[in-house]
Amino acid sequence: MGKYIRPLSDAVFTIASDDLWIESLAIQQLHTTANLPNMQRVVGMPDLHPGRGYPIGAAFFSVGRFYPALVGNDIGCGMALWQTDILARKYNADKFEKRLSDLDDVAEESWLEENLPSAFAQHPWRNSLGSIGGGNHFVELQQIDQIIDAELFALAGLDAQHLQLLVHSGSRGLGQSILQRHIASFSHHGLPEGSDDALRYIAEHDDALAFARINRQLIALRIMQQVKATGSPVLDVAHNFVSACQIGDQQGWLHRKGATPDDNGLVIIPGSRGDYSWLVKPVANEKTLHSLAHGAGRKWGRTECKGRLAAKYTATQLSRTELGSRVICRDKQLIFEEAPQAYKSAESVVQCLVLAGLIIPVARLRPVLTLKNSGGKKG
């Protein structure tokens, strides 16, 4: 365990192995974050990669002050896994691809009126509910490929004969608006705990957390209705948020930016759209700020993807993967940005967490059909 949880300084740690590549800029950003006032410890996950000033795939613990900029603009972003009643042996790729290709990015008003929970019926951002969003957000039908721990798998309520549905999305424009207002007033200086401004941000942050969770539920509902299926939730875990937390004998604030909690039951670590995802049981560890990787982690920046890939692949070719799955994405730029080649191997990230003693693998899931934003509402 010790050789995989690596101290880079008194306050900076990474979960890493010799076989796992981590970009030097991401390490620099870890050190930069550790130098923020009141910051006590920062931990980079195996999927660590550079962000806009602060790293993604990391957890940060501060005392007396917290930093909304570390959470970023997609407050509440996370993963939700559903068990569907779609029989794997009866899955028809052509039929499902057509049905999901016909689904608009944004839910119709009539659908929202019928399906929105009453608590969100008048929410200012209600029209974004049920929509995936851009970037690395997606919905994916998956099939259990390998059961690694049969007992834990059975306890999870999963069924290997039927397909699973994985939803990765967040608070959409709501989180962005909260961060923009905060940065305009306070820049990157953070907020002293207990202040009126801190309490106001936490209230807005918690609203965005709830909004993101409901959004994932509504996305799953829209998808299942579109393919005439039903399902039940297995897990829903956010990886972008800040919360009050005690680490050792210190009471403070734990920020997670692309970091999955290890104290919230089973979690899923997704791969790229052409890679396996892994259902795992966390092993709680205070040294790593009770956090795990949230995915495979990028190895290429978005702006370089098309230049690296366009000479080898067309957008149509990228809509099929080496694992035999299909990808629906009418945004021709995004399909290059989110190509499997732009990401690390999910297995390398999972293996690093296993060697560090931080997870117990439960099952491996293979992508079947991935849906991403089309780049605008289909009309």
Curated annotation (Swiss-Prot):
General remark: Ligation proceeds through 3 nucleotidyl transfer steps, with 2',3'-cyclic phosphate termini being hydrolyzed to 3'-P termini in a step that precedes 3'-P activation with GMP. In the first nucleotidyl transfer step, RtcB2 reacts with GTP to form a covalent RtcB-histidine-GMP intermediate with release of PPi; in the second step, the GMP moiety is transferred to the RNA 3'-P; in the third step, the 5'-OH from the opposite RNA strand attacks the activated 3'-P to form a 3',5'-phosphodiester bond and release GMP.
Protein family membership: Belongs to the RtcB family. RtcB2 subfamily.
Ligand binding (Mn(2+) 1): D74, C77, H137
Gene3D superfamilies: tRNA-splicing ligase RtcB
Residues given in the record as Mn(2+) 2 binding sites: C77, H168, H239
Function: GTP-dependent RNA ligase involved in rRNA repair. Repairs damaged 16S rRNA in 30S subunits that has been cleaved between adenine-1493 and guanosine-1494 (E.coli nubering). This specific cleavage is inflicted by CdiA (ECL_04451) or by colicin E3-type (ColE3) proteins. Poorly repairs damaged rRNA in the 70S ribosome; addition of release factor PrfH improves repair about 3-fold in vitro, probably because PrfH hydrolyzes the nascent chain allowing ribosomal subunit dissociation. In vivo the PrfH-RtcB2 pair restores growth in the presence of ribotoxins that specifically create this damage.
Enzyme Commission no: 6.5.1.8
Cofactor: Mn(2+)
Record: residues binding GMP: N136, H137, F138, V139, E140, H239, N240, S277, H294, G295, A296, G297, K372
Keyword Manganese (UniProt): yes
This protein's record includes keyword Zinc-finger: no
GO biological process: RNA processing; RNA repair
One MF term in the entry's GO annotations: GTP binding
InterPro entries associated with the record: RtcB (IPR001233), RtcB-like_sf (IPR036025), RtcB2 (IPR017510)
SUPFAM superfamilies noted in UniProt: Hypothetical protein PH1602 (SSF103365)
Catalytic activity: a 3'-end 3'-phospho-ribonucleotide-RNA + a 5'-end dephospho-ribonucleoside-RNA + GTP = a ribonucleotidyl-ribonucleotide-RNA + GMP + diphosphate
This protein's name: RNA-splicing ligase RtcB2
Keyword annotations of the record: GTP-binding, Ligase, Manganese, Metal-binding, Nucleotide-binding, RNA repair
Residue intervals passing through the bilayer: none
Catalytic site: H294
Details of cofactor binding: Binds 2 manganese ions per subunit.
